[in-house]
């Protein structure tokens, strides 16, 4: 393999790696947003449950 071929191949490999890293970061960001949304929903549910329990205890 000539040096030109190798450098061309390396160039395309680096381009592909960059695109894969970008896609990975996008997916991780979406996963993180969904995770935080789910955690907030759970926290809200627990706070509501806590409020209901406190009302029952105070009766």
From Swiss-Prot:
Enzyme Commission number: 7.1.2.2
Superkingdom of source: Archaea
UniProt keyword Lipoprotein, yes or no: no
InterPro entries registered for this protein in UniProt: ATPase_A1-cplx_e-su (IPR012508)
Keywords tagged on the record: ATP-binding, Hydrogen ion transport, Ion transport, Nucleotide-binding, Translocase, Transport
Name used for this protein in its record: Membrane-associated ATPase epsilon chain
Reaction it catalyzes: ATP + H2O + 4 H(+)(in) = ADP + phosphate + 5 H(+)(out)
UniProt family annotation: To E.hirae NtpH.
Gene from which this protein is expressed: atpE
Matches recorded under Pfam families: ATP-synt_E_2
Single GO BP term: proton transmembrane transport
GO cellular component: proton-transporting two-sector ATPase complex, catalytic domain
Translocase is among the record's keywords: yes
Assembly and oligomerization: Sul-ATPase is composed of six (or maybe five) subunits: alpha, beta, delta, gamma, C (proteolipid), and possibly epsilon.
Gene Ontology molecular-function annotations: ATP binding; ATPase-coupled transmembrane transporter activity
